[in-house]
Amino acid sequence: MAFRISPLWWPVMTAASPVLVPMLLRKNGRFKKNLTRANELNQERIERAEPLELPKLDFLELTVLVEEKTQEGFLGDAGVSYLFRTDQGSLLYDVGFGPTRPAMAHNAAKLGFTLDQVDALAISHLHCDHMGGIPAQRSKQVTVPEEMGLPGGKTCFLPDEAKAEGFTTELVKGPRLLTAGIASTGPLARSLFILGWTEEQALLARVRDKGVVVFTGCGHPTIEIILKMVRRLSNEPLYAIGGGLHFPVTYGRGNRAGIQFQMLIGTGLPPWRQISDDELSSTIASINEAAPKHVYLSAHDTCDHSLKRFENEVNAETQVLRAGAKYHL
């Protein structure tokens, strides 16, 4: 059994309990209020969403710049950066831990990728593993490794208020087309106990003779809510789902000092509750009900136990995304 917090920390926590317990109780009150608020807001957003005129793309190609799992010669990290290319242009989705860890710059260089090869950047949500590192999250400023070149004023599509040096920032307030024939669901909310109110946008695109492809960053709003929005935006068949779903059931990625951070701070549960196989089973059932033909799993926020269950139990061709790999969607 993996402890979410190493027993070495337990004496410290016991000593700190007179301060820690009241703080957790206050946070729990805010967390519960925000749970209700997020559910109501998402429902309102879905109900008022209008169908999007998604262009029929002749092709949609994904190159994975940052992921936990890798092709040989690439660096893995518990973050995400996906490059989408279409017959109408290209869009970079997230920048992993940016310049604070080596994976983004190393993998981009190995792939020969620089920012002048994309039309725009979209950030799924304002967490460190997607917007460029812990300093980026604290300052709410998207940060990209300088080795990847200058942004040159290109658009950075954001789901919430933030800055992005060198980019022209554009706040996405609802479902809309972005660039390269790729659209955003608009921000969808989730209350997280430690990280607080989180807005996340997923991407969707329509591929000719196939259907709609949906990609998430972490999937914090849950894939069920994201797919409800997608159904409002398009009546085309669902062809593929990809990206993070956040299921660290048995352990988390990127653990530090004996603390399983992903199991504590990103699950949408209070820290004394652990995300379970029952919740994983519910999500697997929801994906099977949606009936995509392909599922592309992110390992950056999902443990190997959960990945294996997805691969074995989802009724679709399922594979785990790897940094350095290309996928023709």
Regions of interest found by a model, annotated:
Residues 2-88, 175-192:
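Zn-dependent metallo-beta-lactamase
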Residues 2-4, 120, 127, 211-213, ...:
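Cap/insert and terminal regions of metallo-dependent hydrolase folds
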Residues 55, 59-111, 196, 200-215:
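Conserved beta-strand hairpin/beta-sheet module of binuclear metal-dependent hydrolase folds
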Residues 67-69, 95-98, 126, 188-189, ...:
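Active-site metal-binding loops of divalent metal-dependent hydrolases
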Residues 100-104, 131, 164-165, 222-225, ...:
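Short, well-ordered alpha-helical microsegments
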Residues 102-154, 233-246:
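Active-site metal-binding motif and surrounding structural segment of the metallo-beta-lactamase
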Residues 144-203, 319-324:
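Metallo-beta-lactamase
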Residues 181-186, 203-223:
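Internal active-site segments that recognize and position negatively charged phosphoryl groups
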